[in-house]
């Protein structure tokens, strides 16, 4: 999965990531697409790097909202979505 695909899948999440509130169903669909496409360690590390880059590039993202997003969508991502995450530690 490319960073462009990760960003495309998360485009509907920007409002929630910035302001909180209700997570749109289309956002959760994107989150689940990313998770389902991350089958190998290399995939998970690549997605992590893309998420880190996106978190740093989009203005106004609330770190607490980013951390809460997987749970709000009913999925478990085995690492924290944060600009400080060490993607190389992901298996």
Curated annotation (Swiss-Prot):
Chain residues that bind a 1,2-diacyl-sn-glycero-3-phosphocholine: 44, 79
Subunit structure: Monomer.
GO biological process terms, semicolon-separated: defense response to fungus; defense response to Gram-positive bacterium; killing of cells of another organism; lipid transport
SUPFAM superfamilies per the UniProt record, alphabetical: Bifunctional inhibitor/lipid-transfer protein/seed storage 2S albumin
UniProt-recorded Gene Ontology molecular function terms: lipid binding
Annotated S-S bridges: 3-50, 13-27, 28-73, 48-87
Family: Belongs to the plant LTP family.
Gene3D superfamilies named among the record's database cross-references: Plant lipid-transfer and hydrophobic proteins
The UniProt record lists the keyword Disulfide bond: yes
Keywords: Antibiotic, Antimicrobial, Disulfide bond, Fungicide, Lipid-binding, Transport
Stored InterPro entries: Bifun_inhib/LTP/seed_sf, Bifunc_inhib/LTP/seed_store, Plant_nsLTP
Protein name as it appears in the record: Non-specific lipid-transfer protein 1
Record's function text: Plant non-specific lipid-transfer proteins transfer phospholipids as well as galactolipids across membranes. May play a role in wax or cutin deposition in the cell walls of expanding epidermal cells and certain secretory tissues. Has antifungal activity against F.solani, F.oxysporum, P.aphanidermatum and S.rolfsii. Has antibacterial activity against the Gram-positive bacterium S.aureus but not against the Gram-negative bacterium S.typhimurium.
Domain of life (superkingdom): Eukaryota
